[in-house]
Amino acid sequence: RKICVIDGRVGFIGGMNIAKRYVKGTGKQKWRDTHLRIEGGGVYALQRAFLIDWYFVDRTLVSNRKYYPPVDSKIRNNCLVQVVTSSPIAPWPDIMQGYVRILLQAQKYVYMETPYFLPTEPVLFAMRTAALAGVDIRLLMPRHSDARMVEWASRSYLMEAIEAGVKVYLYTGGFNHSKLLVSDDNL
């Protein structure tokens, strides 16, 4: 996870790693990524995810109240934030289940962006089902990956998606490391 929480009030999350190549790219290709700034109650959820990971690694429980300032409960710009996390050791695959639900409940469109298209069977099934039902399903992925084996593996899933009506777009401006999903103007 790439999480940064500052004074319990501002959080950043996304795909950005900390190294020069993620800012300037490599000699071979530019690097594109997406990172979000979050304020308000959503920051607590980011901090919680970070502290759970911290405890898992260090066995240190960070509970001092100074790390948890009062939350500004105002909803700005009519925007709500929900942070969903998953891990290989979690009892439920929350992110995967969220993707499946979003895909199967979409009425108009779902636009997805991923650097590595390695869908689980339920996600691929939901993408195909939604596309066959007339939902505009679009997938943006990099034309070339930063890992050749992953690129080949990703390509192996594309025909099945395309045959169901998923529109696949290849990003050619370098390596796109973003992981995004938007659906029906409300998610």
Each language-model region and where it sits:
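Charged, low-complexity intrinsically disordered terminal segments
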Residues: 1-187
